């Protein structure tokens, strides 16, 4: 599993995260695998990805609070509780996830609506709810997504991506096709 706050260049090379070395078979690339989830699908990767992993003990709450400029003890405690209980749609948890995505993925920018997409970009929508997060992609007027270990699928509309479960506010991003697979390690 790749945690946005902690994976390294060596991890990307070793696991061939973006299939740069063509280590995966065609059937794996078609989305018929449990090897990657919705986040990986949205960003063109082929290993499970999560925005953070507080519950695993891999990350420290103080460091995560710094990433989103939380200084008050009550705010840091609110973040800790949200992450511990898997409250992905808590405002601080969403801010942490969004901050990490924008920092890690080259060519990614936050937008207010898909109307802001420019030539050479595709849309990504992010929402949370029910103790989970989900991503959908918007390319040339079509929506698609990948639920956990299930196959990727094209759906009729954005609401079909998220259903009733992912009921947080939706956050939209524009991703440059030419930058897929390029990661910031600063």
Language model: regions and residue ranges:
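Active-site or metal-binding loop neighborhoods of secreted/extracellular toxin and effector enzymes
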Residues: 139-186
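Short linear sequence elements within intrinsically disordered, low-complexity coil regions
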Residues: 12, 46-48, 60, 131, ...
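Alpha-helical structural elements
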Residues: 10-13, 22, 36-38, 43, ...
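Intrinsically disordered, low-complexity N-terminal regions enriched in serine/proline/glycine
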Residues: 14, 26, 40, 51-53, ...
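Active-site nucleophilic cysteine motif
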Residues: 30-57, 75, 90-95, 132-135
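Phenylalanine-focused residue identity feature
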Residues: 2, 7, 18, 43-46, ...
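N-terminal intrinsically disordered, low-complexity, charge/repeat-rich segments that act as generic
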Residues: 1-32, 36
């Amino acid at each position: 599993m790749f945690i946005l706050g902690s994976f390294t260049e060596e991890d990307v090379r070793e696991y061939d995260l973006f299939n740069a070395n063509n280590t995966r078979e065609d059937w794996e690339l078609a989305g018929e695998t449990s090897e990657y989830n919705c986040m990986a699908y949205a960003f063109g990767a082929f290993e499970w990805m999560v925005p953070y992993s507080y519950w695993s003990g891999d990350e420290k709450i103080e460091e995560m609070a710094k990433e989103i400029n939380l200084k008050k003890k009550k705010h840091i405690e609110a973040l800790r509780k949200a992450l511990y209980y898997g409250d992905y749609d808590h405002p601080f948890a969403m801010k942490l996830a969004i901050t990490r995505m924008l920092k890690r993925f080259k060519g990614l920018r936050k937008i207010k609506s898909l109307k802001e997409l420019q030539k050479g970009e595709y849309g990504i929508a992010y929402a949370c709810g029910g103790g989970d997060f989900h991503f959908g992609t918007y390319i040339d007027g079509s929506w698609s997504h990948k639920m956990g270990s299930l196959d990727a699928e094209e759906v009729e509309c954005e609401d079909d991506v998220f259903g009733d479960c992912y009921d947080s506010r939706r956050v939209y991003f524009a991703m440059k096709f030419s930058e897929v697979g390029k990661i910031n390690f600063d």
